Amino acid sequence: NILIMTFGKKAAEHMADVFRERFPSFSVPFFCTIHSFCYRIIRQAEAEGLIKKYSLIVDEEDDPVPEAMDGETANAWIVDESPDEVPSGRTKREDKKKGNRYANPRSPIYLLEKILTKLEYCKKQSEARTFAEQAATVIGCLKNRMMTDEEILRPLPINMGADKRVSIWPVYEAYQKELAEHQPPEMDFDDMLIHALEVLDNPNMQAFWQRKYPYVCVDEAQDTSLLQHAIVQKLHRTGDSLFMVGDDDQSIYAFRGAMPEAMLTFDRRYEDAAVHRMGVNFRSDQQIVLSGDGLIQRNKARAKKTMEAFSKQPGEIRIIDISAARQGQFLLDQARRFCKKQEGGENPESLAILYRNNVSALLPLAYFFKNDVPFVGNKVFDILTLLYSRTAINILAFLCFVLEPDSFQAYSSAYPVWNHYHGLFLNRETAVENLRKQMGEENSGGPILPKLQALLRSLGEMDKARHIGEIWTILQRIQAEDKPDFAIMAMLKELEYNKNGSMKQKNVQLLVMALIRIASLYDSILSFVEAMLALRTKRKWDEHNADKHPVVTLSTMHSAKGQEYDHVIIIDAVEDLMPGDRSKPLPFWHASWQDHVEEERRLFYVAATRARHDLRIVVNGLNSSSPKAPSPFIHEMLRDNPNIPVEKLAADDALEEQIEEAMGIPYFAVRRGKTPGIHREYEKAGVEGYSCPVYRRCTTWRKANRFLNKAVSCPVPETETAPDLPLPVEKALLRLFSVQQLKELDANRLKKIRQKTGYLFSKEAIAAKAVDYAACAPEY
């Protein structure tokens, strides 16, 4: 008659196993997740006819990829998104493949994909899954926060990519209508909690469950939502029947509706409640506990407590300052060290590599795969799914066309890469159809692009023919070089793929940069393509790690919660990811930037305290204002404990600069003005009205840094008086503006004059000089 609820299924199973081991003579209490318990409540109510029968919908099925998916050519494998038949018997019109699984047509994500497409929130089908996942997160959060329809009608946005945010209400309304109108009616996991609470509103059902489980224990209480707390309150009887365990410093699931405030107010919510604070960490050594405690003490919204280490060992924390290009080799060396210990018969120690976002794991994963280093991972499949993104598919398809320039299929697949080149915008189907007629189905006439160029010339499309010729020249140079990293960077820069709209998204940028770094490991384009295709397949993945008993774990910070390892390496501890970009709009579950930073600090604290003995934190550019500046949490730890050693490893600046150049992301270097320094956005640079010698738009951070630190022999004066300018400069100004325009300057004209002359004129100074200018050059 004891009910013990926890956050995850594995945790519940582990607790039950530990209980059986330690108390073999006792009957085992009911260990479960809160969702599985609510499912029991609903099924009991259905059996008694108190509510109508609901069908529970879930997300992904575990159907394996059929052997038929291993196409005869690499290109076919890349572009074929689903076979004609899937294992469940549904056709590909009904299923959308995600990686090597198939979405259930009645899953929340699949339904939201259809709804977003129908409502025209997504112009491209390739965008639908990403936005559907974001919409599912928002909908789940607002349900767990018990928000009313009136509250949801307010503009709660979904982040739909770069500079695009839309209201959730139309999506939410259509989604709930789809579930309600299905026969039988459907519910998702969050609806299951809502229906369970409605059942417990019935006094008879509430009394039934209170009698069945007079004692309730809730583990990981900081992760429960307002809705889940309401269910717990319904199960609670008067007296000492409720026991909750949690750590508000480990509350990291605000996006799921977690509200640690309910736990912090426990003694006010329940009559005669007692709160016991545990201040001893039994996992980590002293330095790790000390640094973690100093970090988390900076949060304001927390219970007052101080953590101490039970261990008497000092432990070790080390900051590793290394370039992103070298990070993969560093992690490979560390993993090999632990594998050698295991092979040598030593007691194996565990190593975990933790990261904020899945894209950070792609580089070490590729290194391990290439060098046959066994490892396990929490949600590794989500990392591999990145290789099925539209951007990754376009890159691999382009490389396949470089390898097979005479293939119609390869041309058709790679077509989106160069279609924006100089505004080419060819109709793919028309071009291919005309080429097929001209050259025959088998295309025995050689490479396609020269033939396409000739076809366009015959149609009088001379500009487009010239551009196709330029593309073919670029492809020939890539073929001659035969370096996959060079090929991807040429695709970005020379074929202008870096101007593609999706490249504005931060995650896409990180993915492309990771692929370039991985490509630099391979000697040829073919070997890189083959490796990426092998990495994408779950079957190959299983073969890679079979029976190797790996001691290395790859995990997100969120998934690592509740785990512990002898050694932990936190990678990509940079400001862009931890706590993120302040200029981006906050999700609605954070009321302020401070709330967001405090949750990110809690997440960093959770990751750091997974380590028992050794913690290493990998940063980029610790002692500079580089584009990957270290997380402020690193500086906080160093201020609290300045004795933490910082180890600076050799950097590969050449590759990093080439990557930045290819990405085409501008940096604004400002020598003087309101915001001197290096900025990623023009608005942040604050250079409106300042002359070119004061600021410069650079294609890489290193170029911007060189400009910023370069000695200026003739500093540009800030003047209220128009100086005597060389006559050619005055004539050039008068070609741009008339005397009258100079007398009546608007902001745009003033900006142009400042840029052309290099002087920070005032409007009044220019107007006063206007007549003198005319006298100097009367012909103007």
Predicted regions: what they are:
Residues 1-56, 63, 67-94, 207, ...:
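P-loop NTPase Walker
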Residues 1-3, 30, 64-65, 160-265, ...:
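Conserved helicase NTPase motor core
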Residues 36-37, 313-315, 345-485, 498-501:
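ATPase/helicase motor core of nucleic-acid motors
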Residues 174-175, 347, 413, 449-559, ...:
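Accessory C-terminal helicase-associated subdomains
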Residues 1, 271-274, 279-373:
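Helicase P-loop NTPase motor core
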Residues 574-651, 656:
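C-terminal accessory regions
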Residues 32-41, 216-220, 245, 359, ...:
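Conserved helicase core region in the C-terminal RecA-like lobe
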Residues 26, 49-173, 182, 186, ...:
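ATP-hydrolysis module of ASCE/P-loop NTPase motor domains
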